[in-house]
């Protein structure tokens, strides 16, 4: 099985919260697609609660679009990581990490403005696969964590696992 890019970085050295360019690629028409690792929690030490991350998934994508789309950037998708330590964001364009971090903080401030669970988009049996698994309180706790922290930048060259380590891990 081919080694995915996300598994070539050392998760024991990742900062959180932090932005990382996980991957860039060109479309056949020459557009750049950038995938960002938005790391909310320190891997293997912290995790977002399932109801909170699910509610954040419903809120985060819209709020990030409000703050990041434009000036050559259009978000394609924002999805939670299975490990519950962050989100992946795929977009058209190449915004600087600082611009992404600023939009992330602004989106978290928007999460705190949501007053009631009934204001969570697509929170119904028709548009959500587990519509009963939500917590606005947990999502807002996550938002407070980000707003109370400096959002750092994780660089791939600083986190790259050396070839000998990958060989040792039999990857």
UniProtKB/Swiss-Prot annotation:
Binds 1 Fe cation per subunit. Its cofactor is Fe cation. Fe cation binds at residues 54, 58, 128. It is an enzyme of class 4 (lyase). It catalyses: S-(5-deoxy-D-ribos-5-yl)-L-homocysteine = (S)-4,5-dihydroxypentane-2,3-dione + L-homocysteine. Its EC number is 4.4.1.21. The keyword NADP does not apply. SUPFAM superfamilies: LuxS/MPP-like metallohydrolase. GO terms for biological process: quorum sensing. InterPro entries: LuxS_sf, Metalloenz_LuxS/M16, S-ribosylhomocysteinase. GO terms for molecular function: iron ion binding; S-ribosylhomocysteine lyase activity. Involved in the synthesis of autoinducer 2 (AI-2) which is secreted by bacteria and is used to communicate both the cell density and the metabolic potential of the environment. The regulation of gene expression in response to changes in cell density is called quorum sensing. Catalyzes the transformation of S-ribosylhomocysteine (RHC) to homocysteine (HC) and 4,5-dihydroxy-2,3-pentadione (DPD). Homodimer. PANTHER family: S-RIBOSYLHOMOCYSTEINE LYASE. Belongs to the LuxS family. This is S-ribosylhomocysteine lyase. It comes from Photorhabdus laumondii subsp. laumondii (strain DSM 15139 / CIP 105565 / TT01) (Photorhabdus luminescens subsp. laumondii).
């Amino acid at each position: 099985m081919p080694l995915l890019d996300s598994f070539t970085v050392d998760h024991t050295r990742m900062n959180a919260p932090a932005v990382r360019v996980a991957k860039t690629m060109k479309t056949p028409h020459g557009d750049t697609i950038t995938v960002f690792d938005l790391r909310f929690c320190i891997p293997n030490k912290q995790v977002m609660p399932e109801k909170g991350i699910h509610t954040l998934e419903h809120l985060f994508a819209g709020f990030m679009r409000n703050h990041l789309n434009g000036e050559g950037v259009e978000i394609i998708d924002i999805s939670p990581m299975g490990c519950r330590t962050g989100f992946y964001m795929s977009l058209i364009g190449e915004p600087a990490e600082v611009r992404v971090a600023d939009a992330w903080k602004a989106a978290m401030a928007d999460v705190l403005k949501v007053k009631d669970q009934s204001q969570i988009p697509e929170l119904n049996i028709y548009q959500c696969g587990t519509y009963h698994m939500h917590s606005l309180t947990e999502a807002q706790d996550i938002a407070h964590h980000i707003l109370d922290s400096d959002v750092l930048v994780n660089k791939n060259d600083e986190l790259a696992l050396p070839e000998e380590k990958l060989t040792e891990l039999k990857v």
